Amino acid sequence: RDRSPSRGLGDVYKRQPDWLSLTGKGYVASMYKKYGKIISPMGCRAFLSPWYEQGGMHPAFDGDEPVFVGRFNIGVVSLHLPMILAKARKESRDFYEVLDYYLELIRRLHIRTYAYLGEMRASTNPLAYCEGGFYGGHLKLTDKIKPVLKTATASFGITALNELQMLYNGKSLVEDGAFALEVMEHINKRVDEFKEEDGNLYAIYGTPAENLCGLQIRQFREQYGIIEGVSDRPYVSNSFHCHVSEDITPIQKQDLENRFWNLSNGGKIQYVKYPIGYNTLAIKSLIRRAMDMGFYEGVNLSLSYCDDCGHEELQMDVCPKCGSKNLTKIDRMLSLIHISEPTRR
């Protein structure tokens, strides 16, 4: 982390493409500024809701500190927002009535999961539940693990906000976004109510949907067919992100996605993909800008190079210089690296 705006980044930005702001705006930075506690992302984007040492979900007094180390998330169930809107229209029902039904359904699933897991014995994982691996994990082998679960979060996942907006009025998140923002505010309000009523640490998670993005399209097409900008591609957009086909600058992408940033505190990331031959000074500037805005920022890179002549391009299937198909392709997306190499004979 870079605590001083005047401090140089050196070459760290080349080695660490994920950046977490502790001094900018928003939830994660506010916890660090007030308590000196870092909410480290789990996996590529998940963040824990605060649990206070004395007060639990809420601080018992001003000095009551949150605990993040040793805690975990028990799972996420994701909404299919475009399909919910399509269903409401087909049945001539209010969209928010249908949305609330599915929010309630996810709520019941989470309650059931807490109850089911709570009946398990600490002997299923002694390191976690008996020897302190998890926060509060000092149970006897025969104890049920329910007391440990009170600090665990359960998430309501969000995908395809771009496709939701497109279905609503034919405009993308770049062109509009007001309806998608209204929906996110409604979901936050309802989940906050569930949280207080149930005493469970529910969170809202911007689902990456690596596999779900394809499943949701197939589900939508089976019911409602192919709609331009909604289901005409083999995938839906990741969480609240602008569609990958949008012709926008990295700064525009940061600003557009910032609208939803504080409405997905259970899991989120903002990222930009750079071509080879990138402007390193521009990347430094964008990282600093992201830190000022309070982002968890990812720098995505791609590279294809010819193993025969050494030619490099962002993407290629055949080398334009020598005609070789003997290529190595590297894709670095968020915290995931994929390397594709030719078959050696």
Q: What is the meaning of each model-derived region?
A:
Residues 2-13, 337-345:
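Single conserved hydrophobic/aromatic residue that forms the stacking wall/gate
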Residues 11-159, 163-167, 273-276, 284-307:
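Structured mid-domain segments that build the active-site/substrate or prosthetic-cofactor binding neighborhood
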Residues 133-136, 172-174, 210-224, 311-313:
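Short glycine/threonine-rich loop-to-helix capping motif typified by GTGT followed
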Residues 315-318, 328-331:
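Short Cys/His-rich "knuckle" micro-motifs
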